[in-house]
Amino acid sequence: MSQILRRYSLLNDASAMYIHENDNWTAFRWNATELMAILEEVNRKQGLLYGRLASLGFDSKLKAMAENLTYEVVYSSEIEGIRLNVDEVRSSIARKLGIENVKQTAPSHYIDSVVAVMLDAVNDYDQLLTKEKICAWQAAFFPTGFSEGSQIEVGQYRTNEEHIISGIFGREKIHYIAPSPERVDEEMAHFLNWFNSQENINSVIRSAIAHFWFVSIHPFEDGNGRLARILSDMLLARADKSKFRFYNISSQINKDKNHYYDILERAQHGDGDITEWIYWYANTLSVALDEAENIVSTILNKSFFWQKASSVPLSQRQTDMLNLFLDGYEAKITSKTWASLAKCSKDTAIRDIQDLVDKDILREDIPGAKRPSYSIIYDPEDITVFFSDVTIEQQNGNHYIKALYKGRLKVCERILPLDAERFEKGDLQLENLLAKYCSYLRIS
């Protein structure tokens, strides 16, 4: 990736002209040879993900999609400097999708509006995109008509010049000047016509183009980035022919915002060759698919656990706490942690935990330890007998457990840093580690 980015950086920085000032500026070009490998990688990961999802029932698929949409909404907003409450977003999505057993948190009207836009786009991915619809979505982002304390135009294309700037007053740096407001209607008509066409282009390239094209027109006074990410996701949904969305690019963009804006800026100063942008977009999507794999593994492991434990009588507090840890909360299960998270006394936490030990739901990590910690028993059977060549490896700042399952299936699952650390110290047994991350393999 670095060689491609470096070379295109040198080429694009040589031009100061904004891309929309070129004749026929939307006749975008790209080097198919340089994109071939990354596009094949994305296609392979998409196939693997949907292959795994085939084993999920409808309810589990819905929960997986809800989790993905939660982080899509949260991180797409955070890219623009808007922080949303994750629990409120999750609750709003769960309620709208009819998902039960989700902690109910009253979302604000604003969060409900933002969630409604995302779900509208997901449900109507195969419908024509119109000016009226996209204007309504933009208006939903700004129900008060204000953005950061300033009144803006909502529900309509902008009528003012739009400069993308950074820096303090008096030392502003102009990164991009969008097409004049007189051009916006015509430019958007051209974009919408292309968006609704059946042009035979690789779906990832098409999604990347939509994102870049839309933010380059910058049709609204605010909300353009979030809308661009929604539109690019819609095109991926059309290619998948599914309203079930299990991966999103926003969480990865949020981790690499500076790079995101830098590459957009270079392409917007370029001559129409957007190879660098497409490559970065596809590579970011590839990482997003890895994240989706982790979410699916977590859901499958959780599903496997509850299949085994569904008949065990538990209090609501015990169920809530188990679900919290099953969803990947990064902490040791101790009476102190339990009391803090469940907002109960330490004595109550000790009773809760001991009851779960007696019911074979939890086991002590190190029997007789002075400060005991516990692991969830996903499977009463010792599953280590099914695995060989087990290693814990670190790649790109993440820890992975790698193994061979039943002598034929290679397994690679990302694990929490705390679990990797505890395993290395001997505080976490291999049996518990494999059970936590690989129990889904036992689903018949």
How should these model regions be labeled?
Residues 1-400, 412, 429-436, 440, ...:
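FIC/Doc superfamily catalytic core
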Residues 404-422:
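Acidic, low-complexity, intrinsically disordered interaction modules
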